[in-house]
Design a protein with these regions (language model features):
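Sec-dependent N-terminal signal peptides
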Residues: 9-18
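N-terminal leader/targeting and pre-domain segments
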Residues: 15, 23-41, 126-128
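Typically the conserved alpha-helix immediately C-terminal to a functionally engaged Cys/Sec
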Residues: 56-70
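Structural micro-motif
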Residues: 91-100
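Non-catalytic, surface beta->alpha helical segment in thiol-disulfide oxidoreductase systems
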Residues: 103-128
Length: 128
């Protein structure tokens, strides 16, 4: 009996560790003011919608963090979908694995659920 309880506790602990390892560590940095100013300036903007528990989002975040270091003139903004539904509604983003690229006022690329670095980078380069 005790062995069975210990096994269940171990499984629960293991699942918790696995989920925590995939958690997105990024915080919302989307600001309406920054977004609108970047659009008005004709800058390239990358908007990322995520959830902290989402494994796909975690992979996307790692790729976008790397891209942010490589593309210095691009504005990278992110927000947690469930906590910022107003942003999602304004930008027409329905899913939390969505990356949208703007060039000024124009949306130039949108990818959903993508974790392939080359495809994400190609979307970003559409805004350059």
């Amino acid at each position: 009996m005790l062995q069975r309880i210990m096994r269940k506790l171990f499984i629960i602990l293991f699942l918790f560790v696995c989920l925590s390892a995939n958690a997105v560590e990024k915080k919302t940095n989307f600001s309406e003011e920054i977004f609108e100013n970047a659009k008005a300036s004709g800058k390239t903007i990358v908007v990322n919608s995520y959830e902290v528990w989402c494994g796909t989002c975690s992979k996307q975040t790692k790729i976008l963090d790397q891209a942010e270091k490589e593309f210095k003139d691009i504005v990278f903004l992110s927000y947690e979908q469930s906590k910022n539904k107003n942003i999602a509604q304004k930008l027409g983003i329905k899913f939390w694995t969505t990356i949208v690229v703007y060039k000024g006022n124009d949306e130039v690329a949108r990818v959903v659920g993508q974790t392939d670095k080359e495809i994400i980078y190609a979307a970003i380069q559409n805004g350059i």
